[in-house]
UniProtKB/Swiss-Prot annotation:
GO biological process, one term: D-amino acid metabolic process
Gene3D superfamilies: 3.40.50.1100
Subunit text: Homodimer.
InterPro entries hit by this protein: ACCD_DCysDesulf, D-Cys_desShydrase, D_Cys_desulphydr_bac, TrpB-like_PALP, TrpB-like_PALP_sf
Catalytic reactions on record: D-cysteine + H2O = hydrogen sulfide + pyruvate + NH4(+) + H(+)
Name of the protein described by the UniProt record: D-cysteine desulfhydrase
Family membership: Belongs to the ACC deaminase/D-cysteine desulfhydrase family.
Role this protein plays: Catalyzes the alpha,beta-elimination reaction of D-cysteine and of several D-cysteine derivatives. It could be a defense mechanism against D-cysteine.
Keywords: Lyase, Pyridoxal phosphate
Cofactor: pyridoxal 5'-phosphate
Electron transport keyword on record: no
Residues modified to N6-(pyridoxal phosphate)lysine: K51
Amino acid sequence: MSLQNLTRFPRLELIGAPTPLEYLPRLSDHLGREIFIKRDDTTPLAMGGNKLRKLEFLAADALREGADTLITAGAIQSNHVRQTAAVAAKLGLHCVALLENPIGTRAENYLSNGNRLLLDLFNTQVEMCDALTDPAAQLDELATRIEAQGYRPYVIPVGGSNALGALGYVESALEISQQCEDAVAISSVVVASGSAGTHAGLAVGLEQLMPQAELIGVTVSRSVADQLPKVVALQQAVANSLELQAKAEIILWDDYFAPGYGTPNEDGMAAVKLLAQLEGILLDPVYTGKAMAGLIDGITQKRFKDEGPILFVHTGGAPALFAYHPHL
């Protein structure tokens, strides 16, 4: 597969140079396995993160349609909403965010610090709801209201996770394969699996470019039974848009997200502290901490296909640390 497959889709150059792919020597020594990390936490805008890859395609489509407003939804501490708001600010667009409080907390840090603080800095119009029970319908209803006020809205789904946004992680797979070429033969790739776009895009790209590497999604919000159909549906939609076959098995581990989305757990927080203390790299309590906990336990329990090098895809999320600091 070549980049030619993606050139049919408008894309904004928001990231620029490839994000680093680094060897983690101290973590590798600690775990007894070669560990590499793809640093998508270092993307430009709003303290970094994976959603910018999706927004390169989604925001380009919004501009193509003549939109003047980006509308999206997520949790109060959503990394996706924060990055969408930053892109809107950069492009001179209005941004409306529909937020929920998925953990039902009244803690002031969660309600006003971290990602939520940054939304105010980006001049985001925030609308609260009791719960995102049907986010697609709720976003459509919000878009109708915003349009009635004279705006031209463009709706971005939760997590930027549709077939168009997930192309950002087909691009990422191309980047990873080029960085690994003649450098390291990655055996396994680990990524947090939430709204499914990042996981699905990587699945399509890596199947074409690094078929020897198993891709493992560590769920952050759902059981395998609930998450698998979401990832598979997006995997197929992305492949269809690129006129490719998607035959790779989707592997999910759901042992590490309890007690639920947005609520830290002991193993996840231990992983956050371990990476900070061994490598000076910041994970987060919601996504990457739990995904790293899965990687660590996967080595201990011998869940990987072999003992070859592992690549951890760091999707960002460090601003949430400031919202969860009592847990640290």
